[in-house]
């Protein structure tokens, strides 16, 4: 299973992960590329750093997207750590993650923007 920028916008991400583990054969692979797209609602450092998720949406009313994101669980948890814990709990045997994009605050804190999770059932 391969997903890219999907998991963050699911109302029930744990259920989605459970379905993924259900349909995968033994030794099946999950590749999930995602990010902390709306974590700025939860974390002041992310908020101060700003977010450029909407730069490519010129002329579009993004308030609708923002209102939806405010209701999503994954807007309020730091990832990929959260995902890794869920994947362990539901039965994935091997889990690796890689940070694909990050930035540093003036204080030196690393902010994870995009990541890859590779999990094997």
Predicted regions mapped to residue ranges:
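A short glycine-rich, Lys/Arg-flanked "PGG" loop and its adjoining helix->strand segment in the class I
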Residues: 14-29
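Short conserved AdoMet
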Residues: 11, 25, 121
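A short, glycine/Asx- and small/polar-enriched loop/turn
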Residues: 109-114
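C-terminal lobe and adjacent flexible extensions of AdoMet/dcAdoMet transferase-like proteins
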Residues: 90, 115-121
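Nucleotide-sugar-dependent glycosyltransferases with a strong bias toward membrane-associated enzymes
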Residues: 10-13, 17, 80
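C-terminal alpha-helical "lid/dimerization" subdomain adjacent to the S-adenosyl-L-methionine
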Residues: 33-107
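A conserved beta-strand element that flanks and buttresses the S-adenosyl-L-methionine
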Residues: 2
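Short catalytic micro-motifs in class I SAM-dependent methyltransferases
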Residues: 5-6
